[in-house]
Amino acid sequence: MPTWLWGLLLTAGTLSAALSPGLPASADPCYDEAREPRSCIPGLVNAALGREVLASSTCGRSANRVCDSSDPQRAHSADLLTSAPGTASPLCWRSDLLQQAPFNVTLTVPLGKAFELVFVSLRFCSAPPTSVALLKSQDHGRSWVPLGFFSSSCTLDYGRLPAPADGPSGPGPEALCFPAPQAQPDGGGLLAFSVQDGSPQGLDLDNSPVLQDWVTATDIRIVLTRPAIQGDTRDGGVTVPYSYSATELQVGGRCKCNGHASRCLLDTHGHLVCDCQHGTEGPDCSRCKPFYCDRPWQRATGQEAHACLACSCNGHARRCRFNMELYRLSGRRSGGVCLNCRHNTAGRHCHYCREGFYRDPGRVLSDRRACRACDCHPVGAAGKTCNQTTGQCPCKDGVTGLTCNRCAPGFQQSRSPVAPCVKTPVPGPTEESSPVEPQDCESHCRPARGSYRISLKKFCRKDYAVQVAVGARGEARGSWTRFPVAVLAVFRSGEERARRGSSALWVPTLDAACGCPRLLPGRRYLLLGGGPGAAAGSTAGRGQGLSAARGSLVLPWRDAWTRRLRRLQRRERRGRCGTA
């Protein structure tokens, strides 16, 4: 940067006045007139103004005839380097008298938070030193890296060649060695360093992470290594006593807010932090707020604000998380996943109703009562869940209604919870047209009576053994009568492949008319079907389900049979049926 420009900036403390904290000129620089987010940065400030300076050597700590820290008129403390200018002849910090090497004196300025540096300047009240090192820290003083060196002998002092006129030759910024500060007519001197002087031309701060890292600092350290005295002092010989003297240490920079804030403020703990916008938070606006993670955090640029977006949860969640895989699959548009959806909603965006609820078409999706309970009838419905769009519950046979709360036309209510609605009976055939006369039943079949012992041999001779509950009266369909049943337990399954659940039991119409077997709605029965004696072609003329044709046995259920049948079932699985 040209010397005349530094002189303009540093005269009469104009920078400190221009860079004092305050509200931005625009009401909200982080948003345009349409309230769309845009990149914004804090104003240029003197980051060192009013900050404490830690000096390794200060004249007057031990009182002498020149300096006395207890006397305001003779005190030359390091705080004078960063105090606001207000006197015609500024007071200067002075180091102790230095008589022999090493002549190193360090001035350290903690900036309080990360800043993006523009320049560093230091005005000397006496002849400026001929060797100075400028360092920065990005971790509040835990580690240091050089920003630049200033020397009349770069190779001897720092092992570096003088800085080329066109900047560094490498692809990224580097600490170069510049000429030592020049003495001025008033007897002092000026150290002026532009941070951009150490970076190659053409790098764009918005789009260069390397340059962003280069200009970022939380602390600045100036190391004065060789005073301006005659002769070479590197050999450590005794010289004329000398002390460094300087004033107006300025660190021009902006609060590092990554393009998401236009100013910095003091928080409740007195720490300097960015006044973050665009859904960001943190001292440097370097992360998204907890609910603003629909896309990953990015630094704002002049082309794109990269504002953090709130997750789309339709007002039903307060927390969400970011999923990179979903973000990629969406074409880098949305990656938020809502957590702990409320108001009976579910889904990534809390956009549908959870199981047992359905969407109320009369309310918007963001309404707290957008999801209504299915309220399926405990007897008439086959389950507790309903269609999430229409609210229709799954009804049992013969049951209808949105909640399955009434019998369908042609059905009447029964006392069975298995089949709450049965087909309305139609008048049966007259005595003249009855296919089986009462007097013929005795010769046709005889209902099972008395006790019945189930042996392994009898069990193995049957195709299947199941426990069924009759849901309604039988319905004659030609030569077969159909009884709706529920299979409650399966002890043996043969070719019929009996399974638990709703089914049908087919009984020959002649047998059903004579009560062989006699099946009553709501009762449970043991069905031993098939086996030797079963009628040939017994499946002809009937539908899917179980059959109780000749050779089958239907007995009123006894709970005591459960253990016996399970034991026979285990013996069958061990292959005992082949020996029975």
Swiss-Prot record:
Tissues where this protein is expressed: Very low levels at 10.5 to 12.5 dpc in dorsal root ganglia. High levels in motor neurons at 13.5, 14.5 and 15.5 dpc. At 11.5 dpc also expressed in the developing limb buds.
**InterPro entries the record matches:** Laminin/Netrin_ECM, Laminin_N, LE_dom, LMN_ATRN_NET-like_EGF, Netrin_domain, Netrin_module_non-TIMP, TIMP-like_OB-fold
Write out the residue ranges of the motif Cell attachment site. Answer: 500-502
User: According to the record, which residues are glycosylated?
Assistant: 104, 387
Residue ranges annotated for the Laminin N-terminal domain, each copy included? 36-254
Q: Where in the cell is it found?
A: Secreted, Extracellular space, Extracellular matrix
Please name every pair of cysteines joined by a disulfide bond in this record.
Answer: 92-125, 255-264, 257-274, 276-285, 288-308, 311-320, 313-338, 341-350, 353-371, 374-386, 376-393, 395-404, 407-421, 441-514, 460-577
**What is this protein for, i.e. what is its function?**
Netrins control guidance of CNS commissural axons and peripheral motor axons.
Q: Please name the PANTHER family in this protein's record.
A: NETRIN-3, NETRIN/LAMININ-RELATED
Protein's name in the database: Netrin-3
Record organism = Mus musculus
At the highest ranks, the source species' classification is:
Eukaryota, Metazoa, Chordata, Craniata, Vertebrata
